[in-house]
């Protein structure tokens, strides 16, 4: 009986050993905690994937924002153009108002009134021209004298040289002197009396110098015409005397022959 009981006990232990199943998760991961860490790692992978989706969404949002920036820049440019047009119109209205109802803070001479009207008219024409250029998109690229906008003394000196070269190329024309007379009068009409006196004095000095040069040139021509010994008339008289003496000798010889 004892031997049978021992054999039965060994059989039970063998069955227990044969059918015992180890947890593969514990065998590989080293326990329940390790197995749990493994699944948590897989969850983290899913989180990374979610972050990639977030990055894609952010890129899409940035791409959608860029056109909005461009639109806002266009709006700013359009607003600037409108503001400039408003200022231009306001300036035109002020000029028109001054032309229709000129203010007279002081008593002006007829010349000064004419100069003021001409100046305002010129401003209005320039304003209209600029507005037309902006409306039709005309290119304002200019060169030479038209490109200059003198503000300093050196700028005006250079501007004067270019202007002189432009005008003096027509000095051989029959209408050049009358053209300058009208031009000088028109450009000086808005000047003050003191400035006009300076210009007048400068022209007076120039006129005196030209008169001296003319007198000197006439004196040189007279000296060239003078001949020693009585001049041209004396020379002609001597020639006639010689001719007469020759005639007299010829007649005398003819009479002796007869």
Curated annotation (Swiss-Prot):
Keywords attached to this entry: Acetylation, Coiled coil, Cytoplasm, Initiation factor, Isopeptide bond, Phosphoprotein, Protein biosynthesis, Ubl conjugation
Pfam families: eIF3_subunit
Cross-linked residues, Glycyl lysine isopeptide (Lys-Gly) (interchain with G-Cter in SUMO2): 106
Biased segments, Acidic residues type: 40-59
Record-listed Phosphotyrosine modification sites: 254
Subcellular location: Cytoplasm
Bias (Basic and acidic residues) ranges: 60-106
GO biological process terms held by the UniProt record: formation of cytoplasmic translation initiation complex; translational initiation
Post-translational modification N-acetylalanine, affected residues: 2
Region ranges (Promotes stable association with the 40S ribosome): 243-258
Processing and modification events after translation: Phosphorylated. Phosphorylation is enhanced upon serum stimulation.
Source species, domain of life: Eukaryota
Region span, Disordered: 1-108, 217-238
Residues recorded with modification Phosphoserine: 11, 13, 20, 127
GO cellular component terms, A-Z: cytosol; eukaryotic 43S preinitiation complex; eukaryotic 48S preinitiation complex; eukaryotic translation initiation factor 3 complex
Coiled-coil annotated spans: 70-135
Disulphide linkage map: none
PTM sites of type Phosphothreonine: 109
PANTHER family the record matches: EUKARYOTIC TRANSLATION INITIATION FACTOR 3 SUBUNIT J (PTHR21681:SF0)
HAMAP family from the UniProt entry: eIF3j
Name by which UniProt lists this protein: Eukaryotic translation initiation factor 3 subunit J
Species for this entry: Homo sapiens
Source lineage: Eukaryota, Metazoa, Chordata, Craniata, Vertebrata
